[in-house]
Curated annotation (Swiss-Prot):
Biological processes per GO annotation: ubiquitin-dependent protein catabolic process via the N-end rule pathway
UniProt enzyme class: transferase
Gene expressing this chain: bpt
Record's keyword annotation contains Acyltransferase: yes
Principal location listed in the UniProt entry: cytoplasm
Gene Ontology CC terms: cytoplasm
Listed EC numbers: 2.3.2.29
Protein name as annotated: Aspartate/glutamate leucyltransferase
Catalytic activity: N-terminal L-glutamyl-[protein] + L-leucyl-tRNA(Leu) = N-terminal L-leucyl-L-glutamyl-[protein] + tRNA(Leu) + H(+); N-terminal L-aspartyl-[protein] + L-leucyl-tRNA(Leu) = N-terminal L-leucyl-L-aspartyl-[protein] + tRNA(Leu) + H(+)
InterPro entries per the UniProt record, alphabetical: Acyl_CoA_acyltransferase (IPR016181), Asp_Glu_LeuTrfase (IPR017138), N-end_Aminoacyl_Trfase (IPR030700), N-end_Aminoacyl_Trfase_C (IPR007472), N-end_Aminoacyl_Trfase_N (IPR007471)
Upper taxonomic lineage: Bacteria, Pseudomonadati, Campylobacterota, Epsilonproteobacteria, Campylobacterales
């Protein structure tokens, strides 16, 4: 298994304007499901064949959060979201790349640029492939959501040994009535329950960042305490 590690220089934090960030990367050519799972449990995130985690000098606001699937019960409002999507077609498949995907990705990020002042990047086919398709091996999938045969949401996930790692989700803002972002996560939870998996790894919760603070609303959940290397056996998550 070829592995190359490197770090970025300090840069402006994408989540907190008054902070600086530094990222550690691992490039793993052919990552196994087991190694992926062990990295995710230790606070890493996968994009393509790259794994990353923050190693910021003066900040520890990025907290890895996971939902406890076996204890999770849908609320009344979440059941309403499911009912609104009774005719939404959901397909679980390996990651795809098409004009439809790229158009939807761009439309979502243009909307977020206007709504939340996100910094927008124009992704080429190759860049999308490198981030969301490459390296899916035997664990990477996408949940594709269709309304009247139109692709309206894509949720990229890894199905691992003890849970589902939620990588990235984007949707058509014209279909806001269907709460597609929330519906996609509820689908992840349903899949995990059916597969007897314990966790949904939601990535980083940042309390002071509106785009990431919502994750704490999904309870019960646990937060990773500290950072651990692969060779360290003790990984502590706490409610």
């Amino acid at each position: 298994m070829l592995e190359i590690g490197f770090c970025t220089l300090e840069d402006q934090c994408p989540y907190l304007k008054d902070k600086r960030s530094r990222i550690e990367y691992k490039y793993i050519e052919n990552c196994s499901k087991e190694i992926n799972n062990e990295l995710i449990k230790r606070g890493w995130r996968r994009f393509g064949r790259y794994f990353s985690r923050p190693i910021c000098k003066d900040c520890d606001e990025c907290l890895s959060l996971r939902i406890l699937v076996n204890e999770y019960n849908f609320s009344r409002s979440e059941r309403r979201v499911v009912n609104k999507n009774i005719n939404t077609k959901v397909i679980l498949r390996t990651p795809n790349l098409s004009n439809e995907h790229l158009f939807l990705y761009d439309k979502y990020h243009r909307f977020m640029e206007e709504k939340k002042n996100w910094k927008r990047y124009d992704l080429s086919f190759k860049q999308y492939y490198n981030l969301y398709v490459d390296g899916f091996m035997n664990f990477g999938y996408e949940l594709a959501f269709y309304i009247e045969d139109k692709l309206v949401c894509v949720d990229l996930i890894d199905i691992l040994e003890d849970g589902i790692s939620s990588i990235y989700c984007f949707y058509d803002p014209d279909f806001s009535y269907f709460s597609l972002g929330k519906f996609s996560l509820l689908n992840e939870i349903q899949i995990a329950k059916k597969m007897n998996l314990d966790y949904i790894y939601l990535g980083y919760f940042v309390k002071k960042c509106q785009s990431l603070s919502y994750k704490a609303d999904y309870t019960p959940n646990e937060i990773l305490k500290g950072t651990k290397e692969l060779f360290e056996n003790e990984v502590l998550w706490e409610k």
